């Protein structure tokens, strides 16, 4: 009996052990499946948190303004969040990688950096990314304000920043820049006309040269692409025999457009402003020409037709303050 009992006991023990092993395996499978579900849920949760953080970053209410309201009681413009804001932030990031190369090249051609500014990064990007009409950039409005400030013998950056140093923005100037860009982006308007009207109200008008008893403007349009920037450069430097002039330069390509500006003076040289890189000065036109053709055009990536390297329009302006 003992041996029999012993025999059955062993069988029963083995059966019990097998059952326990099967049970343990099933339990482990359930736990493993549960772990996968938990890890998947956590991964999804982390993605949601990252997206939420990105949205909050884009819509952050962190104040960088000298005060909450403009002089006439208006608040800093913002719109509802859109996923395009994230896309534009990525594009700005790519462009911002070109800033060091462009700035470092200025001194190599005898130029000086008057002010380091870039709408593609930092505090200014944080401000324009808050509104869908300025998220892609505010280059047109920035150039218009730069021309006005320069014509008045002032610096745009003294007007934009408290104390003329990067940090807090003066809301009146920031609001004005953003609003001009927003006005020019409306579906039923021509942005060039909006800018021209704004400049005219600020004492700056398009140059007109008398030809055959007519007074046409001296706007110039042309192509870059495979031709390179020579035609564009000639249009920028041409002062039409007057010796000076403000230039608003629009560059366009297959997928985007960009505005830059310049003040050209036969005696004092060229002051150049690109909202993506800052304000630079060259004491003579020859220095500027070499820099623009041999360095800037490629370092900025503006030579790519897919970007803004296909065609251009150059507007010339006169000012009462000149």
Swiss-Prot record:
Matching InterPro entries: Papain-like_cys_pep_sf, Peptidase_C58, Peptidase_C58_Yopt
GO biological process terms on file: proteolysis
Positions of the catalytic residues: 139, 258, 274
EC number: 3.4.22.-
Gene Ontology, cellular component aspect: extracellular region
Keywords from the named record: Hydrolase, Plasmid, Protease, Secreted, Thiol protease, Virulence
Coiled coil feature spans: none
Subcellular localization: Secreted
Hydrolase recorded as keyword: yes
Molecular-function annotations in GO: cysteine-type endopeptidase activity
Keyword Secreted listed: yes
Main location per the UniProt record: secreted
CDD domains found in the cross-reference section: C58_YopT
SUPFAM superfamilies according to UniProt: Cysteine proteinases (SSF54001)
Assembly information from the UniProt record: Interacts with human ARHA.
Role summary: Cysteine protease, which is translocated into infected cells and plays a central role in pathogenesis by cleaving the C-terminus end of the human small GTPase RhoA/ARHA, a regulator of cytoskeleton. Once cleaved, ARHA loses its lipid modification, and is released from the cell membrane, leading to the subsequent disruption of actin cytoskeleton of the host cell.
Protein family (similarity comment): Belongs to the peptidase C58 family.
Name listed for the protein in its UniProt record: Cysteine protease yopT1
Lineage start: Bacteria, Pseudomonadati, Pseudomonadota, Gammaproteobacteria, Enterobacterales
